């Protein structure tokens, strides 16, 4: 069995993520999806909790026709020691044989650790970007909904994610500034 690794923050998950995961699953038997920065939430870059991201990702993948029995979702908190990063994430995961990333820095760390790295499938990178989707939410551009599965949009509505982002950007969501 070949198990692949795909790391992201998924803030929020969008169709590009779903399509990338489907493409990865065409090459491997199972995919481990690491929800990185698991400890961060309620900040502009990471507005959703890890629990919300697991929920959104599972529902988005289900909506996209992904066989969830082939998917392992694991939240992993960041560490500030890049040299120890790979050992850190491996301690959270079952074994994997290949990793998919579009991030050159992550690819470097993985390769230095002896991991086979493949280019992450990317679908219309200019359109399907979580940062852009969050910016659209903040600006009141409702077309962000076209970029995420309907189930993800419903969850964002349920947790009042757009309202949360708008409060977060006021700066009051940064305890280190209080």
Curated annotation (Swiss-Prot):
SUPFAM superfamilies: Nucleotidylyl transferase. It holds the Pfam family CTP_transf_like. It is an enzyme of class 2 (transferase). Its EC number is 2.7.7.1. It catalyses: beta-nicotinamide D-ribonucleotide + ATP + H(+) = diphosphate + NAD(+). Keywords: ATP-binding, Cytoplasm, NAD, Nucleotide-binding, Nucleotidyltransferase, Pyridine nucleotide biosynthesis, Transferase. Coiled coil: none annotated. It is found in: Cytoplasm. The keyword Cytoplasm applies. GO terms for cellular component: cytoplasm. Pathway: Cofactor biosynthesis; NAD(+) biosynthesis; NAD(+) from nicotinamide D-ribonucleotide: step 1/1. Disulfide bonds: none annotated. The keyword Manganese does not apply. Its main location: cytoplasm. GO terms for molecular function: ATP binding; nicotinamide-nucleotide adenylyltransferase activity. One of its GO terms (biological process) is NAD biosynthetic process. Belongs to the archaeal NMN adenylyltransferase family. NCBIfam families: arch_NMN_Atrans (TIGR01527), cyt_tran_rel (TIGR00125), PRK01153.1 (NF002243). This is Nicotinamide-nucleotide adenylyltransferase. It comes from Caldivirga maquilingensis (strain ATCC 700844 / DSM 13496 / JCM 10307 / IC-167).
């Amino acid at each position: 069995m070949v198990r692949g690794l795909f790391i992201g923050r998924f803030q929020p998950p969008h169709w590009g993520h779903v399509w990338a995961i489907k493409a990865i699953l065409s090459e491997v038997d199972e995919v481990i999806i690491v929800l990185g920065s698991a400890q961060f939430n309620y900040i502009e870059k990471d507005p959703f909790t890890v629990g919300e991201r697991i929920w959104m990702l599972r529902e988005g993948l289900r909506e996209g026709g992904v066989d969830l029995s082939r998917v392992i979702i694991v939240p992993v908190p960041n560490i500030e020691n890049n040299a120890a990063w790979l050992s850190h994430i491996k301690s959270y995961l079952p074994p994997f044989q290949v990793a998919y990333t579009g991030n050159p820095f992550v690819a470097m760390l993985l390769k230095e650790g002896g991991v086979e790295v493949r280019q992450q499938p990317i679908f219309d990178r200019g359109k399907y970007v979580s940062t852009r989707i969050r910016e659209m939410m903040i600006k009141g551009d409702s077309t962000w909904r076209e970029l995420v599965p309907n189930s993800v949009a419903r969850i964002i509505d349920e947790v009042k994610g757009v309202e949360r982002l708008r409060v977060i950007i006021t700066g009051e969501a940064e305890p280190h500034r209080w």
